[in-house]
Structure formats: C-alpha cells, structure tokens
C-alpha cells in the first residue's frame, strides 16, 4: 500500500466511521424487503410513494451512511486536519439520521404527517450537524489536494440536495407545495447522483486506486480540472432544464462524456496496476465502470423516449455504479481500519487486510448482488422476476453485513489481548 502524503496520525477513532458502515447493509436489507412486498407496477415509476421510499432507504440508509463514514475517516487523513468533536458529532448525527430515515420511510408508506414531520426535523438536524463539522474542518485545510477539493465540491452539492430533500419531504406534509415536487425532485436526484456521490467517488478514487491497488496515479489535468468541468456541466444543466429545457440534452452529453472518460480511465488504471492480483473489489470497480458508462448515456437518450426509462437509468447509475463501488470500498476500508488501528496500538502479529474477510463469501455476495441488479433490470420489462431479484438482493446484503462485521469482531477479540509492542512510550504527555 502507498501511504505517501497521508496524515495517518490524524485518523479519527475507529468508531466514528464504523458506526455508519455497519448500519448501511441493514438499510440495504430493509430496502430489499420493501421491494419484495411492493406492487411491481408501483415501482415502474420514480414518483410513486413506494419508489420514493425504497430509493431513500438505499440513498440515505446505505449510500449516505457509507459516504458520511468515509468523509469522517478520509478527510483528516488526507488533509491533515481534525474534525472537531468527531466522535461525539458522529454519534449524535448517526442517531438522528437512523431515526429520521426510519420515520421518513414509515411516514411515506403510511402517509402519516406526524412521522414525516419528525423525520424532517431529525434528518435536517442530523445532516446539518455532520456536514457542518466537516465544513469546519475543511476551512482549516492549508494544502488542498485533488481529493480534498473534490470532497469540498461534493459537500456543496450535498448541502443543496439536503435542502431540496427536506423541501420535498415538506411537500408530503403540506400539500400546498406539491406542485413543485417534480421539478425539485429532478434536480435533487441529478445533483445527488452526479454532484454529491459522483464527484465524491471521483475524488476518493484519486487516492484509493494508487493506495490500495498500486495503480498509476491520475494525470494532473484529471485531478485539477475534471471536478470543475463536471460541476460546470451540472450548473449548466440546471439552467437549461429550468429555462431552456429543449437544450438540456447538451449539458447531459457534457456530463455523460466526462463520467464515461472517468470510467474508462479507472479501467485502464486497473489494467496497469503493479500488482495485477484480481479480487472481488477489482470486480466491483470494473462492473461499476461499465454500469456508469451505460447509465450515463441511457440518461442522455432517455429524453427521446419521454423519460420512460428513468427507473432503468437509476438502476444503472445508482445501483450498478454508486452502490456497487461503495460495496467494493467497504471491503477495502473496513479491514484497513481494523489493521491500522490495531497496528497503532502495538499489535503486530495480526491478519493482513486481505485475510480478514472470507474471499469465497465476498465473491458469493458479489454474484448475488449482480444477479439482483440484472434481475431488477429484467423486471422492468418482465415483472415476474421481482421476487427472485429482491431475495437475491436481501441475501447479498446479509452476506455483506456478515463480511464487514468479521474484521470488527476480530478487532474486538485482539484488543482484549496484550499488545506485541508497548506504544505508551510514544504517547504525547
């Protein structure tokens, strides 16, 4: 692994990111059961209550939690700054976000104004707290590298989509604003996918591929310009979508081209890595590159089909790209955190990162997840595959939870033993 340029001494307590990581698959399981017991006709449109609830069980409960956990871990290490009160802030934010997400799902599915109101407050405070402490840390950064710049940009988009999301939730409480729901929801989803998640993934990739896979570093043009180019495209799309909708496809093409270029670059970097050993995480990177390419261009051409295939676009980009790459990152980040923190405490005779998760179970989880994604795509045309696809998804999420709990249990077990080396002599007095 390449630790060049990292401030490992600034890493937060292991509990800060782990609490988000360990709960994420549970929301995936919940989303799977919601799909299993939903009416397939209700899932064929993005604006049905079932689709909205399931989408947010995944986007907030799984993707949001993984991204927030990663920000609390990676920002201090990459930028050399301390997130203020990170453990306390993450605990409070975590509790509010879990409670807020669950009450939102209940409120949407039961059309209960009380649950929706409670979730509006919980999610609003939870996101504001977490984003706020991260922004405070970013303001102290002196050396803005490419990854930190991408994180900062993604947080701007995150702030906007959180405000939009809270407004959209408010429209389920007060009907007077429901007429604005579809316009805001469209911007909310596009900026959430490409602006927050997409740009954050690009920034993290600049660091993760060279670090974990000993792949060639990205060129300076890519690291310095691509995030701004995509951001410009997203702002251009917003303006065109609102005022000149007939020309919004031009901005879509702009955005899709640069994400396709990113996907192609990732594929080539993986081909050129100095240790070409394939594991399930490499599979996830490659599959996500394919789904990103397909989804981006599906998104462009969906306009010519009166947006009939928007759900498929969401499956390709939200599922095949963002969801898949997050799972792949969990398989690297969780064992790394366990290994790093045990090492820092003086435990030297511990399993390596690659030994902490059962490789066969990880491969089985990958296969089940891919079957479920492909099954959901087929279900769009042939509804009889819904139940089987949902069951595959549930099983894959259960396996993912088991796989990432295994290193954590190992951490707890080893911590109860005596360290191989006494690190107290190096502690700051």
Protein language model regions, located:
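Hydrophobic alpha-helical transmembrane segments of multi-pass integral membrane proteins
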Residues: 1-429
């Amino acid at each position: 692994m390449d630790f060049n340029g990292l401030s490992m001494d600034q890493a937060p307590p292991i509990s800060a990111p782990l609490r988000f990581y360990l709960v994420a698959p549970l929301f995936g399981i919940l989303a799977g059961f919601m799909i299993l017991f939903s009416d397939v006709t209700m899932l064929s449109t993005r604006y049905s209550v079932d689709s909205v609830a399931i989408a947010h069980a995944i986007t907030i409960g799984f993707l949001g939690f993984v991204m927030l956990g990663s920000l609390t871990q990676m920002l201090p290490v990459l930028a050399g700054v301390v997130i203020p009160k990170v453990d306390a802030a993450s605990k409070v934010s975590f509790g509010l976000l879990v409670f807020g997400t669950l009450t939102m799902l209940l409120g949407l599915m039961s059309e209960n104004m009380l649950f929706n109101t409670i979730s509006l407050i919980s999610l609003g405070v939870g996101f504001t707290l977490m984003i706020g402490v991260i922004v405070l840390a970013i303001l102290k950064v002196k050396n803005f590298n490419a990854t930190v710049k991408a994180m900062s940009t993604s947080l701007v988009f995150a702030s906007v989509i959180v405000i939009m999301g809270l407004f959209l939730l408010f429209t389920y409480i007060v009907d007077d604003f429901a007429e604005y729901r579809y316009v805001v929801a469209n911007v909310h989803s596009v900026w959430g996918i490409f602006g927050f998640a997409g740009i954050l993934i690009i920034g993290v990739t600049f660091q993760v591929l060279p670090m974990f896979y000993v792949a060639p570093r990205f060129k300076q043009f890519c690291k310095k310009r691509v995030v701004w180019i995509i951001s410009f495209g997203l702002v251009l799309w917003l303006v065109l979508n609102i005022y000149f909708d007939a020309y919004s496809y031009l901005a879509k093409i702009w955005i899709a081209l640069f994400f396709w270029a990113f996907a192609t670059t990732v594929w080539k970097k993986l081909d050129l890595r100095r240790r070409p050993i394939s594991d399930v995480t490499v599979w996830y990177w490659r599959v996500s590159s394919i789904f990103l390419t397909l989804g981006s261009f599906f998104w462009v051409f969906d306009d010519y089909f009166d947006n009939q295939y928007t759900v498929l676009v969401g499956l390709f980009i939200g599922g095949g790209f963002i969801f898949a790459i997050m799972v792949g990152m969990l398989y690297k980040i969780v064992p790394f955190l366990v290994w790093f923190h045990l090492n820092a405490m003086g435990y030297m005779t511990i399993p390596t990162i690659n030994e902490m998760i059962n490789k066969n179970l990880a491969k089985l989880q990958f296969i089940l997840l891919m079957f479920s994604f492909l099954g959901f795509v087929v279900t769009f045309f042939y509804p009889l595959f819904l139940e089987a696809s949902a069951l595959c998804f549930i099983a894959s999420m259960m396996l993912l939870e088991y796989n990432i709990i295994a290193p954590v249990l190992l951490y707890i077990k080893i911590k109860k033993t005596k360290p191989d080396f006494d690190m107290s002599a190096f502690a700051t007095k």
